[in-house]
Amino acid sequence: MSKSLLSLFVFMTFLTLKGQETLGEIERLDPQLDLLIPKNASIEVLAKGFVWAEGPLWVPRLNGLLFTDVPKNTAYLWTDKEGLVEFLNPSGMTGHAPHSENEGANGLALDPKGNLVLCQHGDRRVARLKKWQFDKPEYETLVDHYDGKWLNSPNDLTFNKNGDLFFTDPPYGMKRQDEDSLKELSFSGIYKWSFSSGITLLNKSLSRPNGIALSKDEKTVYVGNSDIKNAIIAAFDLVDGNLVNQRIFFDAKTLKRKERGLFDGLKVHSSGVIFTTGPGGVLILNAEGKHLGTIRPGKATANCAFDADEKYLYLTSSDILARIKLK
């Protein structure tokens, strides 16, 4: 397909709606929320037409937001200037590993050197993009095995300042999840990886570890557990590279009874406030775990990300990309 025809196809399939459509509402439960989100803020739809949008990541060198459509095995770039363009295809299923679903990348992150690192569902690995390019992407495997066994389907990730990678590995990228015949590990782990020391299993107590983030002082690790029977955000102290003092930071089991959705992606604001997708939309929690409010797009929301200056929070909500202005 020629580039002109491809551009036309993308334009016709994915409608960019910047400034033309809003949806949902913002629920305010505490005055602290007014310090983060303007009272007149709305949820602005930027693009729609996806199957399951995920993994939003602001990339300064591109001055835009990368995100994935997991079932489409594709990653997109959205910028204020150009709108939406296809960025990576394939994004996460290249035939690298035995797989039961043709799913692409999920979580995205930049390492301390600015390289793009992807949790690749279909390839069952965490990989690095070799070159920043639109066509024919090439990936380098960082980690795909633990104890001689294939990982399940790495889901979300974050780096500390030293370049250590922390990631979660639930079985969501496998067709039958825990019952999938290709699943080799008997648990869903939280791992640390580095070039110097390789992979280390940090914790395997959570049934569905999903979104993961570090506090700004890198002393605490937050992990969302996307299990309908145990809908919690767990917190751990990070001590000498290990996770200790596991505790419940926020318990949503009661909230889950009346709201749709489970914990998925989460990000930590420079103020220490946590923005986490979960029951009802995007929950905003202060550093003590108090629920300040919820951004309610009216759709299942997978993940969220700030831009470089924290002027906007971007949401991947089911079939749409949206954003909300911050203070």
Task: Please place each PLM-identified region on the residue numbering.
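Bacterial Sec-dependent N-terminal signal peptides
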Residues: M1-E21
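Sequence-structural signature of mature extracellular/luminal beta-sheet repeat domains
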Residues: Q20-K327
